[in-house]
Each structure stands twice: as structure tokens, then as C-alpha cells.
Amino acid sequence: MGDVSELKMQITPETPGRIPVLNPFESPSDYSNLHEQTLASPSIFKSTKLPTPGKFRWSIDQLAIINPVEIDPEEIHRQASYLRLSRIDKDVEDKRQKAIEEFFTKDVIVPSPWTDHDGKQPSELHPSKCLSSHDDSPDGKKPSLPSQKCNAACQTLLSLPVDFNLEAILGDYFREEDFVAHTPGNLSSSSLRRKLFLDGNGSICDPLPSPSPGSPPCSARGSLEGQFSSSPIQNSVKKYSLGSVTTSPSAISSPTFSPIALQGGKTPLSEPRKLTFHSPEASCATASTGIVNPSIRSPYIDGCSPIKNWSPRRLRGGPQCLSSLVRIPFTLEAHSEDEEADVSCTGAAPLSTNACGEPRVVTAMSVTQSHSGIAEKERAVLDDAESERENDTVDMVDPTDTVAESTWIKEPVDDGNSPMTDSASGIAFSIENSHMCMSPLAESSVLPYESSAIQMNSDYNTQTCVSNITDIVGTERYCKENVTHTNVPVPFEVEMKSQVNNVTPGHTAQRCWMKSPRPSQCSRP
């Protein structure tokens, strides 16, 4: 350390007033490193030998300047005349070109078909000549034909005219469209999740029509017969498919039901409500054990759910044992539990509103209890409720989101009506002259009525009205209140009336009025 301090003290300051000379390659901090040892490259003092240059030669330009050469103009003229005469000589040029052609026309190189070789005209070879010579041979053996060559215009085996109809000749032997249409793999991969325009047998059309200008295409006729088909049912008298109807609804006397789970449109303020129609066995079992039969709770069947045709007959006497359940969950508007606890109705109470005064609307079908004394009041309240449910729609969504669901019960009867019965309360819904086809699949559902249908696709949350007359199944907001179960059955009647529905402009729907000889008590479940 002492040596370093001594070296720093020996640095003399610069003379004041003199312009300091600064080395741009040095920094002010280099002074502190002068005492350190400098490491030089090992080859810094190594002598390098330069390569010995070769023999020196002057360039052409330098030689022309140093020693110019005199050229005789006569020699220049002589060389020019020689070159000119050699170019004009055609005989020599022809000999050269002939030698070139002979070289390229030998067997080593393939000759061009457009050129004549050895001055011989090649004969043309046609398939017809070969066939005729084969037929004319007496012993039936193929005659040995001499090796012949064809020119460039005859190198095809078959020539067809411009207006030749190849499909008319080969169309009966191969039809690619029919082969692709009947392949099971192509049926499953032809669309996202459904096959379009299929009948009950799974084919595009029952007969395969011959292509003719007057006959419409199969897809056009299939679109007129029904809606989209997801899983057609085979080996049935009437061709039904889940989500499509291939026959006229007017020709069907009894409505057809299948297990289905409908779900109302969800909004951020919506919450599920229950609308339950109990059967004697199901209500007793649920009340005693609190556990619902899994076969009743789950309407979904693996694969394809068959659609059963129920022979209708009218109810007689008291409650009867019910054979099947149809669950229709509804999601109604959101209200607080305090408001729901205060709502109770007697007599005309099913038409009453909540504390806010807004009727709860699910669809355009209204199920009401009318008496001779209060029928006019109930209809007046319904007319007021129509103005408030103009913007209310029901969209089908994925049924797995539904927590609280409702059950509808059906039972075969004798006549042309298909009632859905509440055996505990004796309520019978009798819907006449209407055809209802409900699909259990979540992909699509069709509710046709009088040659009209409405399709709701749950995958994309869309709703499509197909015609002007739709059959919409639902209930008003007051349907969240269940009818009090009594031991005395009360007969009810459902009357179908056609009124204007505000779901889609210009479309009509069916309103269901429920009449009873006396009002019944309603309360929250």
C-alpha cells in the first residue's frame, strides 16, 4: 500500500495556463492503474516473414505504353474479308446443320412425333381396326400386328365428341351420391350434431327417384315433410322421429308424448320454481321417504327414446294409477323469499299478482280457474297481464342446469282426448284437436300444431318460429303456487281458445282456460 501512495505522490500537476493534452483512448482513472503489470501478447515481438513475390510481369496496358506495336492496315482488311466470306458460304452451313440433325435423330435420342423419319409416312393405328382384324380371324386367335407408330394426333385410345352424354351411359352403374348418403360414417359426420331431412328409416327419401327435370330434389321434399331429425325411430307404423313429424298432424287423433325436460329462459335475476302435479303413489312415496325414484327423476334414456302412441280414453271415477311421467321444469322470474311468503290466494287467487303487481309469465298458455261469478274478472286480469309480458320469452337451454323441475303425468284413456291428470286433486287437462311431439334430446324439440311447428335449439340458445300458428306449452307466473291437495276430486276442464300471442309479431298461440264448478284453494308448496 505504501508503494501505491508513493506513486500517486510523484505525479506532478500540470502547468496552469497550459492547454492540457488529453488522449482520447485513455480515461482519467488510468492513472491509478499505472503501477500494475502490463501483460503483452506473446507474439508481439515475433518476426513475421512475408511471402516472396513471384516473377514480375507488366500488364497489357503498361506494355502498350512502354512498347507500342505497329499493325499493318492491309492485314486488318484481309482478316475482315475472310470472316465475311466464311459466313456467306451456305454449303458449309448446310453440312453443319445436317450433321446436327443426324446426331439428334439416332436411336439414342427419342425423335419428335411431329417430324418424318427416313422419308416414310407413319400409318395411323385405331382401336376399330384392331377389333375388326380380331373378329375376322377364323381361328379366333389374335393376329400378330406389325409394330406401327402413331403420330401425335392419334395417341389417344378413345375420342369422344363434344356433346357426348357420358352420364346417360355410366350413370346407372355408379352413383356416388347414393353411396355416400347410405354410409353410416357419413351420416354421423355430415353435420355438427344432427342429420338433416331424414325419415324414419334413416334414408334421405323412401324411394330413390331417377334423376329427371320435373322431379324436385330429395332434400327439398324432406324439408317440407318435417323439421330436423336427430334420431329416427325405425319399425313403427307411423314414421316418427325425435324432433320431426313426417305425417300430417291433422291425421293423428291422439297426441304423442315422450319424456322431455323443458327449461325456461334464464336471466341474471331468474330463479327456479316448481310446478308439480303429483300422482297418488309418487306423492305418498316422496312425502314418506323424501326420495324420488331415479327412473322418474331422469327423463333421459341412453340412445334413442321410443315414442309411444297412447290409446286415449276418458277418465271415469276417482284417481287412478298413472303409468308415466313427463317432467317440464320452468324457470320463473326472480323474487325475494319474503314476497313469496306473503303471497297466498283463495278463489280467484291463481290470477293474483305478487307484491310488485307483476304477473309472472312463462309462456302464452294460461291455465286458470274460472267460475261463473269470477270468470269476467279473471279474463280482465289476463288482458292486463298481456301488456306486461310482451318482452318475456322462453328459451330452451341445457336441461342439466335445472335444479327444481316439475312433473306432468299422462295416462291413456278411451276417446280422442289425451288428458294429463293430477289424481290427488282430480285435475284433468283435456287438450283436443292438437298434436304435440316433444323430444327428450337436448338438441332440438318441436311442438307442431295444425301443420306448424316451433323449434328451439338448446345448443345455441336460439328459437325459430316455423309458421304462424304455434303450440306453446306453459303457464302464467301464478302457476308457481300449487293447488292444495284434497281428498275430494274436483273436475276441471281445459278449453282451447285462439288468441294473439306477443312472442313473435304476426304469430298466434293457444290459450288454455281451465273451468271448474267452484274455486279451489291455492297456497305455496
UniProtKB/Swiss-Prot annotation:
Record keyword Cell division present: yes
Cellular component terms (Gene Ontology): meiotic spindle
Keyword DNA damage: no
Modified residues (Phosphothreonine): 331
Superkingdom classification of source: Eukaryota
Modified residues (Phosphoserine): 191, 250, 305, 311
Keyword terms, alphabetized: Cell cycle, Cell division, Methylation, Mitosis, Phosphoprotein
Chain positions covered by the region annotation Disordered: 114-146, 505-525
Residues the record lists as Omega-N-methylarginine modifications: 316
GO function term, MF aspect, one: protein kinase binding
Gene Ontology biological process terms, A to Z: cell division; regulation of mitotic nuclear division; regulation of mitotic spindle organization; regulation of protein localization
Compositional bias (Basic and acidic residues): 115-142
PTM summary: Phosphorylated by AURKA.
Family named by the database record: Belongs to the BORA family.
Quaternary organization: Interacts with AURKA.
Record function comment: Required for the activation of AURKA at the onset of mitosis.
UniProt protein name: Protein aurora borealis
Organism: Mus musculus (Mouse)
